[in-house]
Protein backbone atom coordinates (compact mmCIF):
# COMPACT_ATOMS: atom_id res chain seq x y z
CA UNK A 1 0.00 0.00 0.00
CA UNK A 2 1.03 3.60 -0.46
CA UNK A 3 -0.07 7.09 0.56
CA UNK A 4 -2.14 7.19 -2.64
CA UNK A 5 -4.34 4.31 -1.39
CA UNK A 6 -7.02 6.52 0.14
CA UNK A 7 -10.63 5.68 0.97
CA UNK A 8 -11.90 7.10 -2.34
CA UNK A 9 -10.05 4.31 -4.22
CA UNK A 10 -12.14 1.55 -2.63
CA UNK A 11 -14.67 -0.38 -4.68
CA UNK A 12 -17.52 -0.13 -2.18
CA UNK A 13 -19.35 -3.26 -3.42
CA UNK A 14 -16.21 -5.36 -3.32
CA UNK A 15 -15.28 -3.91 0.08
CA UNK A 16 -18.72 -4.85 1.45
CA UNK A 17 -18.30 -8.37 0.07
CA UNK A 18 -14.92 -8.69 1.79
CA UNK A 19 -16.32 -7.40 5.07
CA UNK A 20 -19.14 -9.98 4.95
CA UNK A 21 -16.61 -12.73 4.25
CA UNK A 22 -14.43 -11.65 7.19
CA UNK A 23 -17.46 -11.33 9.48
CA UNK A 24 -18.55 -14.91 8.68
CA UNK A 25 -14.99 -16.15 9.13
CA UNK A 26 -14.63 -14.42 12.51
CA UNK A 27 -18.06 -15.63 13.63
CA UNK A 28 -17.13 -19.23 12.84
CA UNK A 29 -13.72 -18.93 14.47
CA UNK A 30 -15.18 -17.43 17.64
CA UNK A 31 -17.91 -20.06 17.89
CA UNK A 32 -15.88 -23.16 17.08
CA UNK A 33 -14.88 -25.45 19.92
CA UNK A 34 -11.67 -26.23 18.03
CA UNK A 35 -10.06 -24.00 15.42
CA UNK A 36 -10.99 -25.22 11.93
CA UNK A 37 -7.44 -25.85 10.74
CA UNK A 38 -6.93 -28.71 8.32
CA UNK A 39 -3.37 -29.85 8.90
CA UNK A 40 -3.72 -32.62 6.31
CA UNK A 41 -4.09 -29.93 3.62
CA UNK A 42 -1.03 -28.17 5.07
CA UNK A 43 0.92 -31.45 4.99
CA UNK A 44 -0.11 -32.09 1.38
CA UNK A 45 1.00 -28.60 0.39
CA UNK A 46 4.30 -29.09 2.21
CA UNK A 47 4.93 -32.42 0.45
CA UNK A 48 4.10 -30.82 -2.93
CA UNK A 49 6.46 -27.91 -2.23
CA UNK A 50 9.28 -30.27 -1.26
CA UNK A 51 8.76 -32.39 -4.36
CA UNK A 52 8.88 -29.25 -6.51
CA UNK A 53 12.11 -28.17 -4.78
CA UNK A 54 13.54 -31.67 -5.28
CA UNK A 55 12.84 -31.32 -9.00
CA UNK A 56 14.52 -27.90 -9.10
CA UNK A 57 17.55 -29.23 -7.18
CA UNK A 58 18.03 -32.42 -9.20
CA UNK A 59 21.46 -31.25 -10.47
CA UNK A 60 22.64 -29.99 -7.08
CA UNK A 61 24.53 -31.86 -4.33
CA UNK A 62 21.56 -31.88 -1.97
CA UNK A 63 19.12 -34.59 -0.97
CA UNK A 64 15.58 -33.64 0.01
CA UNK A 65 14.38 -37.21 0.61
CA UNK A 66 14.67 -36.96 4.40
CA UNK A 67 12.54 -33.81 4.40
CA UNK A 68 9.93 -35.44 2.16
CA UNK A 69 9.79 -38.51 4.44
CA UNK A 70 9.43 -36.28 7.52
CA UNK A 71 6.65 -34.34 5.79
CA UNK A 72 4.88 -37.65 5.10
CA UNK A 73 5.29 -38.57 8.78
CA UNK A 74 3.79 -35.20 9.68
CA UNK A 75 0.84 -35.97 7.40
CA UNK A 76 0.20 -39.20 9.34
CA UNK A 77 0.15 -37.22 12.59
CA UNK A 78 -2.14 -34.61 10.98
CA UNK A 79 -4.61 -37.33 9.94
CA UNK A 80 -4.67 -38.64 13.52
CA UNK A 81 -5.10 -35.10 14.90
CA UNK A 82 -8.03 -34.45 12.56
CA UNK A 83 -9.69 -37.70 13.70
CA UNK A 84 -9.01 -36.84 17.35
CA UNK A 85 -10.44 -33.36 16.81
CA UNK A 86 -13.68 -34.83 15.47
CA UNK A 87 -13.89 -37.30 18.39
CA UNK A 88 -13.45 -34.48 20.90
CA UNK A 89 -16.09 -32.33 19.19
CA UNK A 90 -18.56 -35.23 19.24
CA UNK A 91 -17.73 -36.06 22.86
CA UNK A 92 -18.20 -32.42 23.86
CA UNK A 93 -21.72 -32.35 22.43
CA UNK A 94 -22.67 -35.54 24.32
CA UNK A 95 -20.85 -34.82 27.60
CA UNK A 96 -22.84 -33.84 30.67
CA UNK A 97 -19.64 -32.60 32.37
CA UNK A 98 -17.87 -30.67 29.67
CA UNK A 99 -14.78 -29.76 31.72
CA UNK A 100 -12.61 -32.78 30.81
CA UNK A 101 -13.58 -32.75 27.14
CA UNK A 102 -13.22 -28.97 27.12
CA UNK A 103 -9.67 -29.35 28.42
CA UNK A 104 -8.94 -31.86 25.63
CA UNK A 105 -10.30 -29.34 23.10
CA UNK A 106 -8.11 -26.61 24.60
CA UNK A 107 -5.02 -28.83 24.21
CA UNK A 108 -5.89 -29.63 20.59
CA UNK A 109 -6.42 -25.92 19.87
CA UNK A 110 -3.06 -25.08 21.39
CA UNK A 111 -1.34 -27.79 19.32
CA UNK A 112 -3.04 -26.78 16.06
CA UNK A 113 -2.15 -23.11 16.51
CA UNK A 114 1.42 -23.98 17.51
CA UNK A 115 1.88 -26.27 14.50
CA UNK A 116 0.46 -23.69 12.08
CA UNK A 117 2.81 -21.05 13.52
CA UNK A 118 5.72 -23.48 13.29
CA UNK A 119 5.09 -24.27 9.62
CA UNK A 120 3.80 -20.90 8.33
CA UNK A 121 7.11 -19.09 8.60
CA UNK A 122 8.98 -21.77 6.64
CA UNK A 123 6.29 -22.35 4.02
CA UNK A 124 5.14 -18.82 3.31
CA UNK A 125 7.94 -16.33 3.98
CA UNK A 126 11.50 -15.56 3.09
CA UNK A 127 11.94 -13.28 6.08
CA UNK A 128 11.19 -16.01 8.61
CA UNK A 129 9.38 -16.08 11.91
CA UNK A 130 10.21 -12.55 13.05
CA UNK A 131 10.95 -10.86 9.73
CA UNK A 132 8.64 -9.04 7.38
CA UNK A 133 8.10 -9.77 3.70
CA UNK A 134 6.75 -6.74 1.81
CA UNK A 135 3.12 -6.79 0.68
CA UNK A 136 2.78 -8.65 -2.60
CA UNK A 137 6.34 -9.98 -2.41
CA UNK A 138 6.68 -12.31 -5.40
CA UNK A 139 8.70 -14.99 -3.59
CA UNK A 140 5.94 -15.75 -1.10
CA UNK A 141 4.18 -17.54 -3.94
CA UNK A 142 7.15 -19.86 -4.51
CA UNK A 143 7.57 -23.24 -2.80
CA UNK A 144 9.27 -22.63 0.58
CA UNK A 145 10.89 -19.29 -0.42
CA UNK A 146 13.85 -19.55 1.95
CA UNK A 147 14.89 -22.85 0.26
CA UNK A 148 13.81 -21.85 -3.24
CA UNK A 149 16.17 -18.85 -3.43
CA UNK A 150 19.44 -20.75 -2.73
CA UNK A 151 18.43 -23.51 -5.16
CA UNK A 152 17.77 -21.00 -7.95
CA UNK A 153 21.01 -19.12 -7.21
CA UNK A 154 23.07 -22.35 -7.15
CA UNK A 155 21.60 -23.44 -10.48
CA UNK A 156 22.86 -20.17 -12.00
CA UNK A 157 26.41 -20.33 -10.60
CA UNK A 158 29.63 -22.17 -11.35
CA UNK A 159 29.87 -25.06 -8.83
CA UNK A 160 33.57 -24.23 -8.28
CA UNK A 161 32.93 -20.62 -7.31
CA UNK A 162 33.03 -19.20 -3.80
CA UNK A 163 29.57 -17.71 -4.26
CA UNK A 164 28.18 -21.17 -5.08
CA UNK A 165 29.65 -22.59 -1.85
CA UNK A 166 28.19 -19.70 0.14
CA UNK A 167 24.74 -20.39 -1.32
CA UNK A 168 25.21 -24.11 -0.63
CA UNK A 169 25.88 -23.31 3.03
CA UNK A 170 22.79 -21.08 3.08
CA UNK A 171 20.72 -23.87 1.51
CA UNK A 172 21.84 -26.43 4.09
CA UNK A 173 20.98 -24.04 6.93
CA UNK A 174 17.54 -23.38 5.48
CA UNK A 175 16.91 -27.10 4.96
CA UNK A 176 17.81 -27.63 8.63
CA UNK A 177 15.29 -24.93 9.61
CA UNK A 178 12.61 -26.66 7.57
CA UNK A 179 13.49 -30.04 9.08
CA UNK A 180 13.35 -28.58 12.61
CA UNK A 181 9.92 -27.06 11.94
CA UNK A 182 8.54 -30.35 10.59
CA UNK A 183 10.02 -32.38 13.46
CA UNK A 184 8.70 -29.89 16.04
CA UNK A 185 5.25 -30.13 14.44
CA UNK A 186 5.36 -33.92 14.61
CA UNK A 187 6.39 -33.72 18.28
CA UNK A 188 3.62 -31.23 19.19
CA UNK A 189 1.03 -33.35 17.42
CA UNK A 190 2.23 -36.66 18.89
CA UNK A 191 2.37 -35.34 22.46
CA UNK A 192 -1.09 -33.82 22.11
CA UNK A 193 -2.52 -37.09 20.80
CA UNK A 194 -1.03 -38.98 23.75
CA UNK A 195 -2.36 -36.53 26.34
CA UNK A 196 -5.80 -36.13 24.76
CA UNK A 197 -6.08 -39.90 24.33
CA UNK A 198 -5.70 -40.28 28.10
CA UNK A 199 -8.37 -37.61 28.71
CA UNK A 200 -10.91 -39.42 26.54
CA UNK A 201 -10.44 -42.90 28.05
Annotate the PLM regions.
Residues 1-201:
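Secretory-pathway/membrane protein signature
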Amino acid sequence: HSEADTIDKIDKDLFAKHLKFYAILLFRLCNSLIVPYDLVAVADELINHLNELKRLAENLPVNLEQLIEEAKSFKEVAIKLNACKMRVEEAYVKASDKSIVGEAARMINKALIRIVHELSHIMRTEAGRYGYDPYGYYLTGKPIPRVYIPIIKMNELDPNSTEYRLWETKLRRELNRVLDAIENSIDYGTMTLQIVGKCLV
